[in-house]
């Protein structure tokens, strides 16, 4: 099961994703509006999908269109904490490093990491426009 900020997502979970940025793993973009500077994590939970259906879903997931799945198959949530509990150890990939665990917590720590970005970087283009920077 997965619980984010008190909201539970039960049933068989196919994929649980905690994103603090738009891209990972060579171009996957599951949550296109995720930002590292907003003090929150964007969560994506995919439930009850067979391996074959997941293969069909992979393209949509990789280009930020996972939310187009019908009903409660795909849940999006923006928040500060995600806890995942499993009966058996499951594979968890954290920034490219793999570990196995039955329980894992992802928690946003606002201001916990400082970044330096080039002025006008596309990632912050909308923010730069609001402040008048180029």
PLM region spans:
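Long C-terminal subdomains/extensions of small-metabolite kinases
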Residues: 1-134
């Amino acid at each position: 099961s997965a619980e984010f900020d008190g909201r539970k997502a039960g049933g068989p979970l196919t994929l649980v994703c905690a994103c603090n940025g738009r891209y990972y793993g060579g171009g996957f973009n599951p949550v296109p509006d995720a930002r590292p500077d907003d003090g929150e994590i964007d969560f994506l939970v995919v439930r009850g999908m067979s391996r074959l259906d997941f293969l069909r879903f992979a393209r949509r997931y990789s280009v930020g269109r996972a939310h187009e799945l019908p009903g409660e198959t795909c849940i999006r949530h923006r928040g500060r904490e995600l806890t995942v509990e499993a009966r058996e150890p499951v594979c968890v990939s954290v920034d490219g490093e793999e570990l196995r665990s039955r329980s894992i917590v992802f928690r946003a720590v606002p201001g916990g990491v400082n970044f330096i970005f080039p002025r006008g970087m596309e990632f912050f283009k909308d923010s730069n426009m609001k402040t008048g920077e180029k």
